[in-house]
């Protein structure tokens, strides 16, 4: 029996695939569990339309990410932090703080998990932070840590 997979089934097929499976497997497992439905012209065209819409959505998201990476590349972000002796920070500057400061200064929301630090930031100075949007797309920002003025 030919079925169109509605969900991924390990070892059998992925969402959108149209494959031949045993009749009993299709009738007793795939169709009752709504993992697949019998393949017909209308079902395959519906799946193709959903796949095309998903591809357009992914392409749009990819273009937006590329634009954001281009806008943020080379941006200077400054953070004021409390310091102790020898310009050593109390605690450290985390990716959460950096992401919040990027959003505050540029208006662009960045997920903290996309930020990559080469080392923990525990002293004043200038650091390069990589924002990895996906495996092929990244940008670098310059992070400047300055001492908070005591009043």
From Swiss-Prot:
GO molecular-function term, one example from the UniProt record: structural constituent of ribosome
Protein keywords: Ribonucleoprotein, Ribosomal protein, RNA-binding, rRNA-binding
Any GO BP annotation: translation
Pfam families: Ribosomal_L9_C, Ribosomal_L9_N
The keyword Ribonucleoprotein appears for this protein: yes
A Gene Ontology cellular-component term: ribonucleoprotein complex
Disulfide bonds: none
Function in brief: Binds to the 23S rRNA.
NCBIfam families listed in its UniProt record: L9
PANTHER family: 50S RIBOSOMAL PROTEIN L9
HAMAP family in the record: Ribosomal_bL9 (MF_00503)
Family: Belongs to the bacterial ribosomal protein bL9 family.
Record-given protein name: Large ribosomal subunit protein bL9
Organism: Dehalococcoides mccartyi (strain ATCC BAA-2266 / KCTC 15142 / 195) (Dehalococcoides ethenogenes (strain 195))
Primary gene name: rplI
């Amino acid at each position: 029996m030919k079925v169109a997979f509605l969900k991924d089934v390990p070892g059998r097929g992925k969402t959108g695939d149209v494959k031949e499976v045993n009749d009993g497997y299709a009738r007793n497992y795939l169709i009752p569990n709504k993992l697949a439905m019998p393949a017909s012209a209308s079902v395959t065209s519906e799946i193709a339309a959903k796949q095309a819409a998903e591809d357009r959505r992914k392409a749009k998201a990819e273009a937006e990410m590329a634009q954001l990476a281009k806008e943020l590349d080379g941006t200077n972000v400054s953070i004021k932090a409390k310091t102790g002796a020898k310009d050593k920070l109390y605690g450290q500057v985390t990716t959460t703080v950096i992401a919040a400061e990027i959003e505050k200064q540029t208006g662009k929301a960045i997920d903290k998990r996309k930020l990559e630090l080469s080392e923990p930031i525990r002293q004043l100075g200038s650091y390069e932070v990589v924002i990895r949007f996906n495996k092929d797309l990244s940008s670098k920002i310059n992070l400047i840590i300055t001492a908070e003025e005591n009043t």
